[in-house]
């Protein structure tokens, strides 16, 4: 029998298989590297798209906030202008009615009805006067009460001055024409007579 024997076929197959695996391992490594590079490139594209979309979203949000702020400012400005227009219209209308109130006030002070018929007429127009005053009161109109109050140039117009020892300087002695307010807004200044303190006036003349 020869010393060099042919190995069994099974052994040859195993040996050949190990050799095949050893040869194919570099190809697998190269393929894995390419896939990783492609995946990294795709991730970079996704990240870039994400950043771009985030930037666009931020810009759209900023544009929306600016638009909302502009609309709110427009709404407030329009509302304020409408309120001012309504107030000015109301003020103009009421101011036109004030002379009518003045005439009623003068009639009440001067007319002394004589007889039943005159008294009936007097009560009739006094009823109209009351209706008018109540209507003005409901929309916020109120008369000033100037007499006895310190003179206030924002409310009063001094058309007369009178020296007196009974009041300090700058007190409204008489209301010559009634002033009116619409809420806090002056509809018409009161025309008044204002005191001049006699002692202060005498001291000024002496000096």
Swiss-Prot record:
For molecular function, the Gene Ontology terms on record are: adenyl-nucleotide exchange factor activity; protein homodimerization activity; protein-folding chaperone binding; unfolded protein binding
Give the record's GO biological process terms: protein folding
Q: What does this protein do?
A: Participates actively in the response to hyperosmotic and heat shock by preventing the aggregation of stress-denatured proteins, in association with DnaK and GrpE. It is the nucleotide exchange factor for DnaK and may function as a thermosensor. Unfolded proteins bind initially to DnaJ; upon interaction with the DnaJ-bound protein, DnaK hydrolyzes its bound ATP, resulting in the formation of a stable complex. GrpE releases ADP from DnaK; ATP binding to DnaK triggers the release of the substrate protein, thus completing the reaction cycle.
* Listed Pfam families: GrpE
Region of interest: Disordered: 1-31
What keywords sit in the KW lines?
Chaperone, Cytoplasm, Stress response
Protein name stated in the entry: Protein GrpE
Q: Which domain of life is it from?
A: Bacteria
Which family does the record assign?
Answer: Belongs to the GrpE family.
CDD domains (UniProt xref): GrpE
- Would the keyword Cytoplasm turn up in this protein's UniProt record? yes
| Chain segments annotated as transmembrane | none
Listed GO CC annotations: cytoplasm
Oligomeric form and interacting partners: Homodimer.
- Where found? Cytoplasm
InterPro entries in UniProt: GrpE, GrpE_coiled_coil, GrpE_head
């Amino acid at each position: 029998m020869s010393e060099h024997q042919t190995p069994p076929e099974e052994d040859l197959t195993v040996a050949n298989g190990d050799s095949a695996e050893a040869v194919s391992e570099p190809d697998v490594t190269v393929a894995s590297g390419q896939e990783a590079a492609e995946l990294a490139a795709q991730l970079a594209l996704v990240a870039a798209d994400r950043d771009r979309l985030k930037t666009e979203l931020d810009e759209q949000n900023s544009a929306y906030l600016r638009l909302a702020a502009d609309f709110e400012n427009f709404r407030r400005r329009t509302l304020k202008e409408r309120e001012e227009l309504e107030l000015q219209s109301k003020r103009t209308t009421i101011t036109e009615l004030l002379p009518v109130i003045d005439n009623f006030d003068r009639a009440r002070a001067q007319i002394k009805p004589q007889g039943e018929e005159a008294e009936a007429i007097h009560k009739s127009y006094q009823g109209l006067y009351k209706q008018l005053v109540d209507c003005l009161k409901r929309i916020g109109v109120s008369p000033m009460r100037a007499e006895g109050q310190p003179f206030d140039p924002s409310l009063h117009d001094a058309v007369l001055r009178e020296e007196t020892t009974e009041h300090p300087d700058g007190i409204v002695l008489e209301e010559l024409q009634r002033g009116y307010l619409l809420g806090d807004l002056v509809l018409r200044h009161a025309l008044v007579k204002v005191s001049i303190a006699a002692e202060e006036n005498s001291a000024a003349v002496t000096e």
